[in-house]
Amino acid sequence: MRAILTVLTALFVLLPYPAFAQNVLRIGLNDDPDALDPTISRAYTGRLVFAALCDKLFDVTPDLKIVPQLATGYEWSADRKSITIKLHPNVRFQDGEPFNAESVKFNIERHQTTPGSFRKSEIAEIQSIEVVNDLTVRFHLSQPLVPLLAALTDRAGMMVSPKAAKALGDKFGTQPVCAGPYKFVQRVAQGKIVVEKVADYWDKGAFAVDRIEFVPITDSSSRLASLRSGDLQMIERVSPTDLAEIRGDSKLKVTGVPELGYQMIPLNVANGPKSKALSDVRLRQALDLAIDRETLVKTVFNGEYIAGNQFISPESPYYDKKVPVAKRDVAKAKQLLKEAGQPNLSFTLVVPPERDRQEASLILQAMWAEAGITANLQTQENVTMLQSGRKGDFEAYFTFWSGRPDPDGNVYTFMTCKGAQNDQHYCNQDVDALLTKARQVADQAERKKLYDQATEIMAKDVPRLILWHRRVFTGFSTRVTGFTPYPDGIIRFRGLKLAN
């Protein structure tokens, strides 16, 4: 017996500790995230990784109420031109540095001053930041900013270690250090991103999974096969065509909630030489009129999604009923093309290698062809596509926006003249004024009037083709418990468990 115990003890010592202690959750992503730096990130899949890495000042509940995360509370001034935020005590960044008011000041200023920041326009009204004491910070605004708290529930509110950010500079996204429950371990491009639970996280008892691996698999069939085989335990943004297979597997579950965002095709209006193809508004209107959105949704997505043409879903109180999804009118589209002097319009549409958008682009190509329009389809990795969009190296590209709890987050950064994500360089001064004023008005009815006016102008200008609103489906193994779906599609790891 003593000999057997000796052998078992030796084996215990030789085997790596994780084989006994760690439980590893593997999540299949639709594509590889861009830089893991909240300031310059714009890819949706990056937000899924940040949910583990980077806590925010605020978060949302499943019913979209804004609640403190790294903050403990806040108070607006009477004129809503300053906000005082109390911070959680005893929080440290993953490098051991303390989280405090000074670090909040550093992060907000970093968002505002970093070249290429996508957060700058989200918090542009923050004029100065006052460190009241170690756990109290006050933002002074140039004018009221109603959607500020909503912005701080996402990347604008994510806090990174000032020490690490200063040391790494523009390479920070390769070795991110935040204040979340999981720390960065490794990234293999197009392979996986690995994070591990932080031993001294202030609320570590709420997180049961020891290690998370995010695995980009662009082909949805392969992603589903990996879930069914057990190689993955969760997959995000399940395609509607895969739902029946998941629902028929007793070892799997799927949840679905209406998304906050929309699927879209930005059209290059004025961003560099490639804008010439679609700079004439009549050509953009023709593209819009040649689309049958209802048929598109039924054909590609089995009717699981909602046809749309606005930056908010028909289920939102801000939806403008005066601008319904237009009926297809091929004759009118041809007339507009003729008036613009391009009866045989040809342009290039860049599409990422993801099944839903690949299949939708083929249907769109056929619809446009019936109006005499040639759409040349070009496949490009999602991150590369977004980088090309930033540079103006596109005529049109197929992307999406996952949506934000406040309507401002769905439109301001894309449609204002100096918006950080206005890749098409659309600029309408009336739209600018309306969207800017909507940021300052707290009354919902008054805000809706402003958004309605902007929506009606944009519907005529067609700077981007908004096509549908998804239901966000998440597939997962029955080994996974404690998962709660959110309308933003982001997986929260608090309370989530993985059975052996």
Question: Residue locations for each model-derived region?
Answer:
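Ligand-site clamp/hinge motif
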Residues: 199-245, 281, 365-366, 374-376
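Alpha-helical secondary-structure segments
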Residues: 26, 100-107, 134-138, 180-181, ...
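Aromatic- and charge-enriched surface segment that lines or borders ligand/interaction sites
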Residues: 72-117, 132, 138-140, 226, ...
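Append "and occasionally in soluble cytosolic enzymes with long acidic Gly/Pro-rich linkers
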Residues: 197, 248, 255, 278-366, ...
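Gly/Pro-rich hinge or "lid" segments in bacterial periplasmic/extracellular proteins
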Residues: 65, 153-207, 211-213, 221, ...
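Extracytoplasmic/peripheral linker and loop segments enriched in polar/acidic and small residues
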Residues: 285, 297, 374-385, 412-478, ...
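N-terminal lobe/hinge region of extracytoplasmic solute-binding protein
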Residues: 28-78, 109, 174-178
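Surface-exposed binding/hinge segments that line
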Residues: 75, 86, 120-163, 479
